[in-house]
Each structure stands twice: as structure tokens, then as C-alpha cells.
Regions:
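Functionally important transmembrane alpha-helices
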Residues: 164-216
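Non-catalytic, topology-defining segments of multipass membrane proteins
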Residues: 1-128, 132-161, 207-221
Length: 221
């Protein structure tokens, strides 16, 4: 039990580390290179106002990444066998196949779970906090209710890794990819963030990450 918890939190700590490295990178670009980065923002803000957004969202994000893994870890160790991730040898062909499969399953699950939290009752109770973000900024990626964090983020984005990926290397590559993609979609840059920013202004479109489910089911906008 305790060994499994250690294995899970070993992965989760990598997830958190990757998230904050990404956010710090965007923070440096947004603040230290403001004159350049603001030219490419969908909604350019004064530098001080942008800094205030980071300060507003960060405490909630830190609380989420500390508290949410507690119930998630207990659930995960009863459902997932992590031992094979530490014993299976890495092969590049297996890695590519597993990453493609993980990306596909994750997109399907994320779309479904995201649409569920847009059911009016659940939206008002859990998901509305995230949609209070009207000016996109990288740290707001995890500016969510704690149960929203568990249900519509952790489960669809993390669980497929443990069922599909066969090595720790593949799993960690996936974490880098999905977190970078998610943060870029919230970072507020033209072209890179426009699709998800449209979702924050019109909650009936663009539920997915890479949008193939939206195109398939008629919610692409």
C-alpha cells in the first residue's frame, strides 16, 4: 500500500514540477519581456494588471495541487498497478504507439468529463470558478474548484497514462506534452490559445484539447 502510494506521488510530483516550470517560463515571458509578449496576446493587459492576475490565481492553484492528490492517490493505488512502469524496458516504437493511444483516449475522456461539468447544476457548483477567468493567463490552467480538479482534469488527463503507458519514461514524456499543451491553451497568445479562449467566452463550443471530438460532435467553433 505505502509503496504504491510512493510510486503514485513520485509521478504526481513530476506532474506538479512540470506544471510550475511551465508557468514560471510563461511568467518570465509575460512580465520580464512584457513589451514583446504583449504584442502577441489575444487580450493585452497593462503589466501591473497581468501581474495581479498571477497573484490572484496562484494561491488557489497551489492549494489544488497539494490537496487534490490526496483522494486521487488513494483511489489510484487501488485501481492501478504501477510496478510494471518501473520494470518494463523502454522501446521507442512502443513509446510512440502508447503516446498516440494515450492522446486519443485522453481527448475522448476529457471531452466527456468536460461536457458533464457543463451540466447547469455541476457547472454552477464546480466549474464556474474556472470560467471566471475571462483574460487568459498560463497559471489559470489549474484555477479550478478542487473537485473539478479531480473529476475533469486529473481523471481524464492522468489515469490513461497508468493503463496505457508501459514505462516511466513514456509516462513522463506524456506529462510534459499534455501540461505544455494545456498551459499554452490558457496562456492567451494569438493562434496558440484562441480555440480555448473561445470556450471561455462561449461555453457551448470547444470542449476538447485538440478539438477532434468537437469537430466530430459538432461543438467546434
Amino acid at each position: 500500500m505505502f509503496e504504491k502510494l510512493y510510486q503514485f506521488y513520485d509521478f504526481y510530483s513530476y506532474f506538479v514540477f512540470t506544471y510550475f516550470i511551465n508557468v514560471f517560463f510563461h511568467y518570465v515571458i509575460d512580465i520580464s519581456y512584457y513589451d514583446i509578449s504583449s504584442k502577441y496576446k489575444i487580450i493585452p493587459l497593462p503589466k501591473l494588471e497581468l501581474l495581479n492576475l498571477y497573484q490572484k490565481y496562484l494561491p488557489v492553484v497551489v492549494k489544488n495541487v497539494i490537496i487534490s492528490p490526496i483522494p486521487f492517490g488513494v483511489i489510484a493505488v487501488h485501481l492501478v498497478n504501477l510496478d510494471s512502469l518501473y520494470t518494463t524496458r523502454f522501446h521507442i516504437t512502443d513509446c510512440i504507439f502508447e503516446l498516440v493511444l494515450t492522446a486519443t483516449i485522453t481527448e475522448i475522456l476529457f471531452y466527456i468529463f468536460h461536457r458533464i461539468v457543463h451540466i447547469p447544476f455541476l457547472y454552477k457548483r464546480f466549474h464556474k470558478l474556472h470560467h471566471s477567468v475571462t483574460t487568459p493567463v498560463s497559471v489559470a490552467t489549474l484555477y479550478v474548484d478542487q473537485w473539478d480538479m479531480l473529476f475533469s482534469n486529473s481523471i481524464p488527463l492522468v489515469f490513461p497514462v497508468f493503463f496505457i503507458c508501459s514505462t516511466t519514461i513514456t509516462a513522463k514524456i506524456w506529462f510534459i506534452f499534455i501540461l505544455t499543451e494545456s498551459i499554452l491553451s490558457h496562456a492567451g497568445y494569438k493562434y496558440l490559445s484562441e480555440a480555448h479562449n473561445k470556450h471561455h467566452t462561449d461555453i457551448n463550443i470547444n470542449y476538447g484539447n485538440n478539438l477532434f471530438m468537437d469537430k466530430l460532435l459538432g461543438t467546434y467553433g
